[in-house]
Amino acid sequence: METLGSLKNVTAAEIYNTVSGTPWNGGRADSSNILDVASANGVFFQYVAADDCHFYNGDACRSYIMVQAEELSQKAILEAIQAGRFYASQGPRIHQITVENDTVTVECSPVSCAVFNSHLVWSDDRCKTGDGMTKIVYPRSDYGDGERFVRVHLTDAQGNQAWSNIIHF
């Protein structure tokens, strides 16, 4: 944690990298656990998913970011990334995330699982499951001192995932 906390001027951290997963590299593709611990300790990053292709069979073009830029130009894309207007994905689309009255609403492409991760070790109704969910509503937990933030993790029926950036309350 000391090392992560000492990092400055970091645009984003890689939450998922396909080539680090099995069968190529021993199942270390997902770094969400360590990033969640960092967030719980007040060290916040924006999240990207990426594939630095090594030309293994099946490692290319599986993880990426979706950017909400004003136009399709390098300048606009970089501005959107710096402003945090992006999310990491392997397929599921996050159309909109809104926070109103301590309730998070996610509108997305059809998913079968939505998890609202936070600094709390437990939160009632954190995991939502169902077939083809396109709107998921999550009330902020008041367990303990209440949630300070959440991160949305979506999984579709094919096992593809999407990760939002941190949503602060």
Pin down the residues of each PLM region.
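Charged catalytic cores and adjacent phosphate/nucleic-acid-binding surfaces used
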Residues: 2-169
